[in-house]
Amino acid sequence: MWGFGGGRIFGIFSAPVLVAVVCCAQSVNDPGNMSFVKETVDKLLKGYDIRLRPDFGGPPVCVGMNIDIASIDMVSEVNMDYTLTMYFQQYWRDKRLAYAGIPLNLTLDNRVADQLWVPDTYFLNDKKSFVHGVTVKNRMIRLHPDGTVLYGLRITTTAACMMDLRRYPLDEQNCTLEIESYGYTTDDIEFYWRGGDNAVTGVERIELPQFSIVEYRLVSKNVVFATGAYPRLSLSFRLKRNIGYFILQTYMPSILITILSWVSFWINYDASAARVALGITTVLTMTTINTHLRETLPKIPYVKAIDMYLMGCFVFVFLALLEYAFVNYIFFGKGPQRQKKLAEKSAKANNDRSRFEGSRVDTHGNILLTSLEIHNEVASNEVTTSVTDARNSTISFDNSGIQYRKQSSHRESLGRRSSDRTGSHSKRGHLRRRSSQLKIKIPDLTDVNAIDRWSRMVFPFTFSLFNLIYWLYYVN
């Protein structure tokens, strides 16, 4: 019962309000009252001086701003800028434009903006901007009964964005939009973000081919110049570059070309045409990739991350070509010449030895020795012990001054020969063991097959290590 009575009371009190609203709406749309609206607008504009700001001589005008971002069209590393399309709204109160008798907001033609005072807002880091003009100039003026003015524009601006490309393309960039008053100082005008952190909308709708918007920040501050302090609002975007495009377009081709250059290690070393053609092709391909990349980036003095990677791949490809040059030199150049010289020297030594040994015994059966041989025998341990005993051997001189040694007895000769042979065998065994150890530690660089075998292991290992260090450093 009480609920039914309460509903009747609410209906009784709400009915006049609804009637008043409907009557006001009808009165505005009534052709007879359109003249009243026209007279109101004419009255507002009559005597209005756009040269003076609202509350001239009084407190500064507070201008609130909203931005609805339509799109970020382009981020250019070459020009160091980005292009932004947005709906830019400014709010302020002008008591000269307050009106009564019409309980509605008045949305006027965009040409009325030329007859009203508007803030002298400009974009500090702007390079090129324009207000869209299809089909009419995209700007709006809306008046509120209390004198609040909404001034909206659809703007496309290209703003400067100074980028640090040292970690390109694994980088993050910070691009800002600086909004400032050109002529009015903080004594005349103040800027603020209308709605606080919600003053900028549409960021979540933005999709960029190469970037992702990590976050955005709103900043309000005053900056001081020689002519005074000016209000400034900043909208800052933190952009993280998407690596997927560069992996497919740059990194993967470079890796595959580097691996392709290693195929020459499995090609026979005497196939010069195949190995040289493969090496030169891979080097030229890496050069083409480097050239194309430099055309898409500005001419900056420091080295970028992608430059380091491409330079590393180029070095590996170039070293693979040099490896075959070294193999070719060993096989066709230095190696055969050295072997020929060694063979000639060995044959000459054998001939000299056989001829010399035939002339070392005189007619009496004595073995002729040179002074150098006697010195060597005296210096050795075996000869020293035998020289101390005068009964073992006798050294004499003939009339020509040539020293000779008489042959010892058969038993002494056999004993001395066996001891010499044992000592020489032990020395040879020791030298052979040392040489085998050195061969295990150091590969024979005169063997072209060994060079190719080692290259098959060393090149992939070092390239994998290079990739590990590169990605750990730049990703983290």
From Swiss-Prot:
PROSITE patterns per the UniProt record, alphabetical: NEUROTR_ION_CHANNEL
Domain of life: Eukaryota
Extracellular topological domain residue ranges: 26-246, 293-304, 474-476
Binding-site residues, 4-aminobutanoate: E180, Y182, T227
GO cellular component terms, semicolon-separated: chloride channel complex; cytoplasmic vesicle membrane; GABA-A receptor complex; plasma membrane; postsynaptic specialization membrane
UniProt key word Transcription regulation: no
Name of protein: Gamma-aminobutyric acid receptor subunit beta-3
Native source organism of the sequence: Gallus gallus (Chicken)
Lineage: Eukaryota, Metazoa, Chordata, Craniata, Vertebrata
